[in-house]
Amino acid sequence: MNPNQKIITIGSVSLTIATICFLMQIAILVTTVTLHFKQYECDYPANNQAMPCEPIIIERNITEIVYLTNTTIEKEVCPKLVEYRNWSKPQCKITGFAPFSKDNSIRLSAGGDIWVTREPYVSCDPGKCYQFALGQGTTLDNKHSNDTIHDRTPHRTLLMNELGVPFHLGTRQVCIAWSSSSCHDGKAWLHVCVTGYDKNATASFIYDGRLVDSIGSWSQNILRTQESECVCINGTCTVVMTDGSASGRADTKILFIEEGKIVHTSPLSGSAQHVEECSCYPRYPGVRCICRDNWKGSNRPVVDINVKDYSINSSYVCSGLVGDTPRNNDRSSSSYCQNPNNEKGTHGVKGWAFDDGNDVWMGRTISEDSRSGYETFKVIGGWSTPNSKLQINRQVIVDSDNRSGYSGIFSVEGKSCINRCFYVELIRGREQETRVWWTSNSIVVFCGTSGTYGTGSWPDGADINIMPI
């Protein structure tokens, strides 16, 4: 090959390489521009309906990094379409309950600024669980904590933190309340907050951080609600509220709420004689609640709520191993599904249970007379067979030498089923522990498991002798 041919060959190869590089740069530029403007090609609702843009429910700030030679491309992911929760999955099959969370609020109060609370509960949005409680407007190591045994003051507020985070000074005060309920409909939080005079209280309905509706006392005798989570199905939330005597006939209503607005109110119907402090859970297509009869029965009332036609039915848990405190011993206690058992029915404590086919899972204090200890178990036939007493899978949550308190249910939606969880309020201070002047609580939380589990006891654990007075 002569010198001229070599020059021509080298020039041709160089030109070819230059052309290929030029085309690659054009391809990279086109790819970059295409990915950059891809965010405008998301599928939005056809009727020009605005998409909510709140950080709780919209994931707009996720980036994917793609490397092409030396070019970095950022692609914004389209926002997820937010939908109402419908709770249509089946209930998880469980063998018992496993430990989930404990906040140790009282122990931490010995050396830190922790709120004085009572009436705690837990509820979850689609991505995270939160703990709630009614604060007393003071921390424990504060003279304002004196005499906080009282339930209803204008200083009480609903507190909200991520589950497992004690109520420290930076805790959000959601609303003014001495009785409350909260739930997430899939788009935003609903809070039902009761406060005011005993004879003329107000319930405020706060949705997505805004006050949307309210209702005043209808029987002028301590309007009150669940002290645990409400339930929302396809955008309709239900909450059970009672106004009237705590030891006689009262007026219970079930309110149906859509995005904070009361759309319907149904009176209690069925055979339940007295209903307070219901622990409710989704039982698609409706809602089921296990409540407290503070008048006639130590067996717990059941309230079934039809979300579609607003109809209500009520009865009692069939299990002869009853769930309230005080109660008869297990040999002499009874329940026949339809009526209160008239066994130590006066007084009581908030509690929970849930159906599992014909059986029932339930929790209760170990003591028959006081809020001490806590146990869970399953009663075979306890949902369908009158006075059934065959107990299996018993677990001790708090040993009988330690105090407990209120307890309630909350539901968590998994990939294939809905799990049931519960919390136990661990009360400390007055009236029983008179060395101190305050009354407050911590909580322990368990969730259903299909696996195996061991044994233990999870009391509050604070040494009252080293606590602030």
Curated annotation (Swiss-Prot):
Regulation: Inhibited by the neuraminidase inhibitors zanamivir (Relenza) and oseltamivir (Tamiflu). These drugs interfere with the release of progeny virus from infected cells and are effective against all influenza strains. Resistance to neuraminidase inhibitors is quite rare.
Sites where the protein binds Ca(2+): 293, 297, 324
UniProt PTM: N-glycosylated.
Region (Involved in apical transport and lipid raft association): 11-33
SUPFAM superfamilies: Sialidases
Binding site for substrate: 118, 152, 276-277, 292, 371
Keywords: Calcium, Disulfide bond, Glycoprotein, Glycosidase, Host cell membrane, Host membrane, Hydrolase, Membrane, Metal-binding, Signal-anchor, Transmembrane, Transmembrane helix, Virion
Cofactor: Ca(2+)
Residues listed as glycosylation sites in the UniProt record: 61, 70, 86, 146, 200, 234, 313, 402
EC number in record: 3.2.1.18
Record has GTP-binding as a keyword: no
Intravirion side: 1-9
Annotated segments matching region Hypervariable stalk region: 36-88
Bilayer-crossing regions: 10-30
GO CC annotation: host cell plasma membrane; membrane; virion membrane
GO biological process, one term: carbohydrate metabolic process
Region (Head of neuraminidase): 91-469
Cited function: Catalyzes the removal of terminal sialic acid residues from viral and cellular glycoconjugates. Cleaves off the terminal sialic acids on the glycosylated HA during virus budding to facilitate virus release. Additionally helps virus spread through the circulation by further removing sialic acids from the cell surface. These cleavages prevent self-aggregation and ensure the efficient spread of the progeny virus from cell to cell. Otherwise, infection would be limited to one round of replication.
Miscellaneous information on this protein: The influenza A genome consist of 8 RNA segments. Genetic variation of hemagglutinin and/or neuraminidase genes results in the emergence of new influenza strains. The mechanism of variation can be the result of point mutations or the result of genetic reassortment between segments of two different strains.
UniProt domain comment: Intact N-terminus is essential for virion morphogenesis. Possesses two apical sorting signals, one in the ectodomain, which is likely to be a glycan, and the other in the transmembrane domain. The transmembrane domain also plays a role in lipid raft association.
Identification of the protein by name: Neuraminidase
Provenance organism: Influenza A virus (strain A/Swine/Colorado/1/1977 H3N2)
Record gene name: NA
